[in-house]
Structures are given as structure tokens and as C-alpha cells.
Amino acid sequence: MAIVSYHDLVYTEVLIIIPPGTSRHYPDPALTNLGFQQNQQVGSDYRDLYINPSPPKQILGISKDKYLSSQIYASAPAEQVHLNAATAFLQGLYPPLDEKTASETINNGSTIPAPLDGSQIPVIRAEDSNSPSSIWINGAKQCPGITRSQQQLSHNSTYTDKVDSTRSFYEQFWPLLRNVSDYEHKSNLSYENAYDIFDLINVGLIHNDSIRDAVTGENLLQLRTLADTHEFDRASNFHAHPNGRIDAISARTLSAAIISRINQTITSNGTNKFSLLSGGYEPMLAFFRLHDLTTPSPDFYGLPEYASTLTFGLFTEEDVTTFPDADEDLKIRFVFRNGSNPDRTLTAFPLFGKNEISLPWTEFLYEMSQLSTDTAGEWCKICNPSQKQKPLCSSFRSSYYTSSDSYDHGHGHKGISNAASGVVGAVVMLGILTAAAGGAFLFLRRRWERTGPVGSLLGTGVPRKGGIRSLTMSIGSERVRV
């Protein structure tokens, strides 16, 4: 197993999974003290790696001690558990300032100490479910197309066989859950609710002494394994629809968000140093499947542990003092850390069916954009929610939907409207340039200057994407710890 290092990391992006809190079975799950500590520990570990004096992988020009909102971007759904998880991470990344640094001196000579013992309060964008930006972190939420697809999955013979074969296993937990809403009837204890049952019992084992002796380690492992399988199948049921756009939607919108944040760093010459997206496990699982990460490691079939992180590092292997040239010097590496335990290291994995764990930025951008849904209008077209389900989509219906341009759930046909013509034109341009370069996209020297349609996440400096390509990939198996 090779050990890889590089000189100046100029950007890194992180996605946090839901931390250990109250069970998601109940409305408005909350972050527990344990969850806050775990996310704070992960933030502290990232600080040691990227920010502290003489770190192993330095983020170029980042503030060492004082949190600067101009350098750090953070976004989360407008839900308590996600916002608090992001806060905990960032307070680990930037711990309380010492008294001297935090104090201020005013004109009369008085020294004013900082409140909260110097704790730094990060700025986090709370994405309301009615905001166009809400789809990027979890594109599956309020997407009725997902519900229809998952209903198809529930009629699959393999799925129904699993429900039948595990029924007696689940029903043994009825004495524990009979007083929990939705489980008053034993019949609801089944594989169909695999994650919810695992979540209730797992959280209970952490916080409730009364059930510790009622669930064996073997039982918990089986509950976890069944939840792994159930949720992975739901997140990656790409064959329920011919081109898989619906079932991969959360991974595709997440891919667009990643492109957008990295591109923001490049177009600003590194002003934005670090971006944090706080979300749940569902887009993670879909991302693993969409980008075929299960081939280099079967661990990606399972649910990520609490406070797991995906990281996309934009870096250069050259010794630099100013922001590098995007076309020639910048590379991307994807790394994953499963959970918050200090012994869990960031591990690099290849993407897009390639063997290399580091790709030129332009190549990464091209590959990633093939598998992204980068406008709210496109999301609305794929998911086709009612105005009540997603009011924001009403603004796209007149320009993006026509009677002949509706999304055909039977054949996966996607018509071309005026609002999408900019995308199609750019696709043709991209195809011509790629062919002219002999397929060597990474050698292109010109930066693309094209503004996307209404609701575009990519903005300027990003080539528009092509059509949805086949998901039959072969990926290298090299795994590198960094």
C-alpha cells in the first residue's frame, strides 16, 4: 500500500454524515452531546491535518487560528441535527481563541474579553426545503420519482423473499418496540423498515440502559447488515428506470454541488479555502454506487458510520506561493474517512473507473459533470413534484415543461426546451473540442466561460455537461492511505 504525499493543498471539501443523535424515527432529531463531541473531534483532526502550524498537508493561505467566514463556506439543510453537526465540526476546525488573541482594546484603553471564553461562532447557510439550493445536499428529498421507483423495488422477488425470510428475526424485537409509534403492530417489524429499526435499537443501546441486555452483539450486527443492504439498494436502484437518473438523483445533485464549490475556489484564485456540506447518509450511498466505489472496496456497500466524511482535495504537486494554473497544475483527490475514531485515517480511492487516485482538475471536472444534475430546473423535470410538494418548481414549468416535453417515466425520454438549449449547445461544443484534442481533455488550455441556465449551480468557469452516460464502469483497485 503506497503512501502518497503532496506539497500544498489549496482546497478541500467535506461532507458530514448525520452524527449520533436521537433516532430519526421521531420528528426533528437532535444532536446529542456525544454527537457534538464526535463531530468536533473530526473537525479537530482535519485541523491537525490541514491548518495547524506545519501541517502534513497545508491549505495555502488559510487563517491559522481565527475563523474567517470569507475563507470558509458551510451549508446544511435547515434542520437542527445538520446545522449543529456543521457547527461542531467547524468549532473543532477552529477551536476557542486564547485570551490575548480574542480580546479587543477600545479607544478608552479598556480591554474587552471575547464572550463564551473565546469560542468562535461559524456562519452556516441553512437551506430551507423551499429554496432552490436545498436540492444539492439531498436531491432525493421531496422527489416523488424516488418514491415510485422504491415502490417498484418493493415488488422485486429478491426483495420480497428477503422480507419473508427475515420476518421472524425482526418480530423478536417487538417487546422492545411495541410502545414506539408505528410499531404497535408486530407486522410492521419487518425488513421493509430495516434502517428505522436498526436506528431505534442502535441509538437505544447508546443511551438507554434498559435495552442493553435485550440485544446481543450478534443481533445488532445482523440488524446493521440488513440495514446496509436495504438502504444501499434503495439508494442505488438504478435499473428501476432505464437511465437511472431518478434513483441516482441525490448523487447527481451532490456531484454538481462538489463541482460548484471547487470551481468557486478556482475562479476566485483560492479565496475560498474550505467548504463544508453537512448532510445525511442517503446521498453518500448513492454517490458510492454512482461512482462505482464498491469495486475498489466492498466497505462502500455498507452504511457509513456516524460523523463520516467525504473529502475532495484540490492540490498541486508543485511548490507554489500563488494560486496555481487550473489547466496545468491542479489535481483532485477523493478521500474517505469512516467515522470519528482517531485510528480511522483518510483513505484515497479512484473514481470514474480509473486506476489513478489523483486526476487533473480538468479531467475530474469533465467526468464529474457527466454524472451531475446541475440545475434546479433539471431536477424539477426529473422528479416532477407537484407545486405543493416543491413550490420552487412552479417557476420552471412554463419554460422547462411543455406538453411534448414532459418527463416520460416509461421510456426515459427527455425533450429539449429553449431553457435547456444552452446546455445542449455546450454539449456539442464539448464533444467537438474533446474529439479535436484526441480525447485528451486534460490538455485543454482554455477556461470555459459560460453561464448556466436559471438555477445553475455551476456558474462561470465550468464546461456544461453532456448526456447521461452508461454506468457500466471498471474501476482500479489501488487503495492509498494519505
Language model features: what each stretch is:
Residues A2-Q71, P77-S275, Y281-V482:
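Signature for phosphate-centric chemistry
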